[in-house]
């Protein structure tokens, strides 16, 4: 069954801006969950961590290892909180659409993973790529940063600029494609369960297996997004490109 997105459009200076209300709602929910995780896991910190403090410290150590695998900690340390926030945000966003979906009588899909929306993932990737440019200019200087696009000879500038656009697209669309495909198959399996009396024989085992696989894929995609983001960042802030 085809689902529709709850869209609203605003006319601004003659241009129609279309917003997906479901994606906005799910992004807010994701942000709230990440905020609560941060608050709960960092309350009453102790020198000897246990339980939830162990979890958040493991996340920080894991992300630090990603950063250190791409650049010196002296430069990469300032991106630590950014990367931790991103990996938690993307992981939670990837997981939200797995347990269930909420669809109204009019077939409007309200509850889903926000990362199953290409607009969301491309916005995340665009923001990340723009941040790499910002820190590249800030840490290396405008002249050195722009001049690097023309090395070792100026015709490469065209290829380097094209690479920036392709990096943005691949970073965002990779995340979107994997999460969207996972939720699509889950909806098909759920439809198989309710479509016939015998559908549950295949549908329920398939749902269980695919749910587990989707958790794995969602986790891997969060890791890949952060890893590639730090790779791109290291290329921009390093003294050599």
From Swiss-Prot:
Keywords: ATP synthesis, Cell membrane, CF(0), Hydrogen ion transport, Ion transport, Membrane, Transmembrane, Transmembrane helix, Transport. The chain crosses the membrane at residues 21-41, 83-103, 117-137, 175-195, 218-238. Pfam families: ATP-synt_A. The keyword Methyltransferase does not apply. GO terms for biological process: proton motive force-driven plasma membrane ATP synthesis. Its main location: membrane. It is found in: Cell membrane. CDD domains: ATP-synt_Fo_a_6 (cd00310). The keyword Iron does not apply. Coiled coil: none annotated. It is a multi-pass membrane protein. One of its GO terms (cellular component) is proton-transporting ATP synthase complex. One of its GO terms (molecular function) is proton-transporting ATP synthase activity, rotational mechanism. It comes from the Bacteria. InterPro entries: ATP_syn_F0_a_bact/chloroplast, ATP_synth_F0_asu, ATP_synth_F0_asu_AS, F0_ATP_A_sf. Key component of the proton channel; it plays a direct role in the translocation of protons across the membrane. F-type ATPases have 2 components, CF(1) - the catalytic core - and CF(0) - the membrane proton channel. CF(1) has five subunits: alpha(3), beta(3), gamma(1), delta(1), epsilon(1). CF(0) has three main subunits: a(1), b(2) and c(9-12). The alpha and beta chains form an alternating ring which encloses part of the gamma chain. CF(1) is attached to CF(0) by a central stalk formed by the gamma and epsilon chains, while a peripheral stalk is formed by the delta and b chains. Belongs to the ATPase A chain family. This is ATP synthase subunit a.
